[in-house]
């Protein structure tokens, strides 16, 4: 039996199909209890077809142990009549006819490291945002030139000099707030860096990727998290296409597209490959990636296009290393040992107890005590916070419940 599931945030619609006709349809809530009710109604071993979405990913993990789960890409064409039941019926029938592309369902391990890598990237962007705010604050007060002799104002010497700068009171308050925010993000970045190093230390594929010039611990884990099982890519060209480092085609009849756009692919994988290319370019020794980049650049190609071309070559090397389960043949032994040593030292760090799961409830209680209750109510609310303290207690109870 095949079962089509149209998954939504609050409710899922299910259509059961026996190969000839629809035998039944029912709805269930998108909760654990609702999924258990689904399992009671649908026989074990059935094929569950789910449309790719955030809710669909959660359902696929919960149903994968009991059913054969097919996660499919959403249909590209529009329909004149659209209901949840029709959508569920359409995806189950089109999947049976192989009209829809099936999506890769990563294992729980791959999902976990994907989450850690995404968090690290987000924290890095927040750090860059706060640093830009500090630079803008200094430029507004026309004192940026006083720090020209320092290459990085967020280094040890730069922060010492920054602490002696005199600014107007409101700007000093803003600077203190930015630095406090920066300190928090840097601490989180360090903790995630430790988690990534521990993942790398226990993953053979990641350590093989680190033998490639330009790929460090983070980029290796990022590449591994997005590729998952390399066996799902039949050739290196398939991996390059998945990463989006190949030209996009838009040909029709006698018309041949001559644009320079790159195919849309996995954003995180493309980001990791371009980071690896930049690392290989900045390395002291000449690698095949560095020589290839120089060759492309000498033809008058812009640096961005040359990096994408080198990223395609990097993707081919990654596919070869992961497929053969052998280290990169042109690896720099000294640099590889150095990267492994740095990885081991990071993995040995002790994560502060303040970020342990056991501390979550304590952190929530402390956060509730610091909440500005006035901001929780609209300015035209009937509640008067200053006179009715029971509102604050009720809000605490709601959050802690």
Model-derived regions, located:
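Conserved DEDDh/DEDDy metal-dependent 3′-5′ exonuclease domain
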Residues: 37-78
């Amino acid at each position: 039996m095949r079962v089509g599931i149209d998954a939504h945030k609050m409710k899922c619609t299910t259509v059961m199909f026996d190969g000839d006709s629809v035998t039944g349809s029912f709805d269930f809530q998108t909760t654990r209890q609702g999924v258990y009710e689904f399992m009671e109604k649908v026989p074990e071993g059935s094929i569950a077809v789910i449309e790719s979405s955030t809710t669909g990913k959660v359902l696929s993990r919960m149903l994968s142990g009991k059913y054969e789960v097919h996660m499919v890409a959403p249909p590209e064409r529009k329909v004149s009549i659209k209901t949840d039941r029709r959508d569920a019926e359409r995806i189950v029938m089109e999947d049976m006819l192989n009209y829809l592309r099936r999506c890769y369902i990563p294992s729980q391990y791959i999902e976990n490291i994907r989450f850690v890598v995404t968090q690290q990237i987000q924290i890095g962007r927040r750090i860059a945002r706060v640093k830009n705010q500090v630079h803008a604050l200094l430029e507004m007060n026309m004192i940026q030139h006083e720090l020209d002799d320092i290459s990085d104002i967020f280094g040890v010497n730069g922060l010492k000099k920054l602490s002696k700068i005199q600014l107007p009171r409101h700007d000093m308050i803003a600077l203190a707030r930015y630095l406090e925010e920066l300190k928090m993000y840097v601490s989180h970045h360090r903790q995630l860096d430790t988690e990534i190093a521990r993942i790398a230390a226990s993953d053979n594929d990641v350590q093989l990727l680190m033998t490639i010039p330009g790929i460090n611990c983070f980029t290796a884990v990022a590449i591994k998290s997005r590729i998952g099982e390399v066996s799902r890519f039949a050739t290196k060209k398939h991996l390059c296409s998945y990463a989006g480092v190949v030209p996009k085609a838009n040909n029709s009849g006698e018309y041949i597209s001559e644009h320079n756009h790159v195919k849309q692919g996995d954003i995180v994988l493309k980001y990791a490959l371009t980071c690896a290319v930049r690392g290989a370019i900045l390395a002291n020794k000449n690698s095949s990636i560095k020589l290839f980049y120089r060759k492309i650049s000498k033809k008058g190609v812009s640096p961005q296009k040359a990096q994408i071309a080198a990223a395609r070559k990097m993707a081919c090397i990654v596919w070869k290393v992961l497929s053969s389960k052998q280290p990169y043949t042109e690896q720099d032994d000294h640099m590889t040992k150095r990267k492994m040593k740095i990885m081991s030292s990071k993995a040995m760090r002790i994560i502060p107890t303040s970020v342990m799961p056991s501390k979550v409830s304590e952190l929530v209680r402390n956060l509730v005590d610091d909440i500005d209750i006035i901001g929780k109510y609209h300015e035209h609310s009937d509640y008067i916070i200053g006179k009715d303290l029971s509102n604050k207690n009720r809000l605490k109870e709601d959050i802690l419940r």
